[in-house]
Amino acid sequence: MHETTLKREGASTPSNPTPSTHAAGSGKIYIRTFGCQMNEYDSDKMVDVLREDQGLEMTDNPEEADVILFNTCSVREKAQEKVFSDLGRVQHLKKLNPNLVIGVGGCVASQEGAAIVKRAPYVDVVFGPQTLHRLPELIRRRRDEGVSQVDISFPEIEKFDNMPPSRVEGATAFVSIMEGCSKYCSFCVVPYTRGEEVSRPFEDVLTEVADLADQGVREVTLLGQNVNAYRGRIEGSDEIADFAMLLEYVHEIPGIERIRYTTSHPKEMTQRMVEAYARLPKLVSFLHLPVQAGSDRVLAAMKRGYTALEFKSVVRKLRAARPNLTLSSDFIVGFPGETEEDFQKTMKLIADVGFDTSFSFVYSRRPGTPAADLQDDTPQDVKLKRLQQLQALINEQAAAIAQSMVGTRQRLLVEGPSRRDPNELMGRTENNRIVNFEGPSRLIGNMVDVIITHAFTNSLRGRVAGTEESDQGAA
């Protein structure tokens, strides 16, 4: 489970914190974010609505915050206990600042609802992914009525109609184009925590992307639980825009130079989507396409809706359209009933397809899902051993891809200072590889060509491309 705070890193707790003394309208907000990019996007929107309504600004120190929010994820095991553990760490701040508001949002909030307040009465607001736009109202009601507020309803796409314009810094941005999931995989809680699939209107998405481009954004990542299931209403028409059509229109927005999207579903990878990789050069040569397993028996038990052969067929079509396409994927190891033979079929699929990265986990039972009722008789040590084998194979493939890039010419979007050395810069290739290199700060936010000189485990090193003579031989 991915975990961030806005400002991207949580602050440590001093032994003698001081109470917050900010006046209304000049306070601060601290958000800790768990989970996927959708949650990161939602956290940014929480800041936007509270900044516009109450003048709050971000802090990376919970001790100076007037509002503390936890944006939670319920995908992994023991997510609820993690939330209560984190809540316990900030409870003492209430005594120091009685006006402090503590809130829980995201998918755990959607699952647990009022049970969070019952167990942790010091929590002031509980809200779901679809009601984050109501945060200012919930906070006001909590302060006016003195009673904790809970709103985990599913008002479909309403939240996007109540969002202030995005305010971004940097050359990249997320744009949520749909919410929820209607696939109901047997292991997954998302349909129960985020609701059914609902797409934003076509023009709304294009307007947001165009506004971001006007602010200097060069790369957008289109977000959705099943992003390629997008079906957006076109204003003044009975026509519905599918995801391929949306990509075609985003591709034409001036200023946008790269388009990414996540997360996609193999069943929704239409022929028109495949053809987009041949026709739309701004669509990057990197795709996250979760497969989960390589055994047809396990895939059927997961209710994924495709076979291993069908998945490989989709990949073949995509790579025919874009030969240099690299893939990442999701894998669940130790799903109930998985045999050694099933696992070896997953390993064969990985060997056949080739992946650059993966998010792979040991199966964890999620209450309320159909898979929770299946007998889970695989010993934990066996699951962990399989996970290690799977990750080792993908790491081997990733290392080979990285090594193959040494000596090649790659176009980067320069995102900012390098995390390894603040005197250097960091950019990202089309296939999502981080490259550290020396260069002037004026390159930040721009595209630049580099020659890859070294490959490491989690990054590449390069130098800014010079003349053709000095770079002779670079592909």
From Swiss-Prot:
What does the entry list as the binding residues for [4Fe-4S] cluster 2?
181, 185, 188
The record's catalysed reaction(s) read: N(6)-dimethylallyladenosine(37) in tRNA + (sulfur carrier)-SH + AH2 + 2 S-adenosyl-L-methionine = 2-methylsulfanyl-N(6)-dimethylallyladenosine(37) in tRNA + (sulfur carrier)-H + 5'-deoxyadenosine + L-methionine + A + S-adenosyl-L-homocysteine + 2 H(+)
Enzyme Commission designation = 2.8.4.3
Protein name (Swiss-Prot/TrEMBL):
tRNA-2-methylthio-N(6)-dimethylallyladenosine synthase
Instruction: Tell me which SUPFAM superfamilies the record gives.
Output: Radical SAM enzymes (SSF102114)
Example GO molecular function: metal ion binding
Q: Does the keyword Cell inner membrane apply?
A: no
What are the boundaries of the region Disordered?
1-25
Organism for this UniProt entry: Bordetella avium (strain 197N)
